[in-house]
Amino acid sequence: FTVIEGARISAIRMKFECVADIGMNSVLAEYHRELLEQYDLLFVDMSYGGSHADIGNTEAHLKNYMQKNLRPEGGLWSGPGVRDFLTMTTDQVRIGQYSIASDEGGSVLKRQVTDRMSDYPLGAVLEKISLGTSEIDKYGLESRDVGAERSRYEAEIEEIGRPVEEVEEGVFEEVPLDNPADAANATRSIGVLNMVLEDASSVSAVKVDANQYISHRSRMQGTGMCREAASLTGEPNELVFQVYLFEKCGYYGEEMEKSLLKYQIEYILAGKNVDWQNLEYVARRLLRWREVANVIYILSDSAKVAEAHAAAGALAAVLACPALLEPVAYTILFAWAYVESLQDVKTLFSGGRVPIMKTAADWKTGINSLKNVRGSLTADSGGRGLNYKEYLQIMVFLLNQEKRTFRAMDIMEMDIRRTPGNAAFRMDACFDTYEAELSVSSRFGYAYEMTRLYGFY
């Protein structure tokens, strides 16, 4: 009897170990297929394609898997006359810890991305982004307000006032300024895309309800990052995640055919609910950067400064009132830098390159372009410096980490929901590691418990 009971106890323990392993791996085998196919991510969806996401669903799946393996139907050891030597039952399955993709600001998601791209050569990308961000910071492209500087010169012109001339005896009229800068500045209200694109109507106008997505709604919470997974695969790397985004998301000129929003990187940057608005945001930001850089350059170019003074000095109002010469010349220089910046944005949207800081050889527009801004802009796919994607990479690098991460998850939700059976898909319903507390018993009076941690790492 003692020998038989000892064998029974050993068999129960062994079977418990095997069944727990089979069950917990079976849960992981239910990973979300679309998430893997589209984004190379391994997560289990707690809703299992439904609208109710809860860890209780996974507990039920795990318990079912265990019970089926404890008491299998059919096979060699079942049927009439066959006695179960163990007769085991799953008493309890409790998942106390589980790492949801959005936990800790999305660190769970980014840990997996970092692990999957651990061999990616980052050196060249890092160097280009570092040099770009350093130049942007050095020259104040994000912080300098050239609009306010331009306004000061315009205010000075207004303070000086227009000269008057006698048009007939006793009748005096202001001499019109006819400042060429005014014609250029009048286009500022038109919108950058309308100025730089050959056919602005071709821009996507897809609109989404942003409140449906993870960055805008309340989120389910797991128990945070699995420290064991992080210790084995490494902590999340923001630069790796950024490189991953450019592999998995579309942007202007490189749109993803099956995506809901066509300008996904632009959405990550702007967070607007309409494609057009996201692209316009990026275009305006590019224009602002380029305008600061071009103002810095043009004010250092003595030939262009002299050209602007000559153009200002030829105006009748300036001839009649020499005090207007300096402020008018500077408004011309600022307007010229603005037109050059529009040309830069058009070049970038045409597949060309533009250096962050220019030399004389990089300058494209002439002073006469101020009178016919749109007509003077040309599509240019050449040049040196950075292209549109590389400017976007710098913008994404400068973006707040949380916005970058959760807007990226918005994109994932948008596109996964377009696939069959995933209409209610949520990133905050997906986990990649979990710890289960398991207990079984036998009708022979034995009971055992164990805790196991399983996951994708």
Language model region names:
Residues 33, 41-457:
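Long, compositionally biased low-complexity segments
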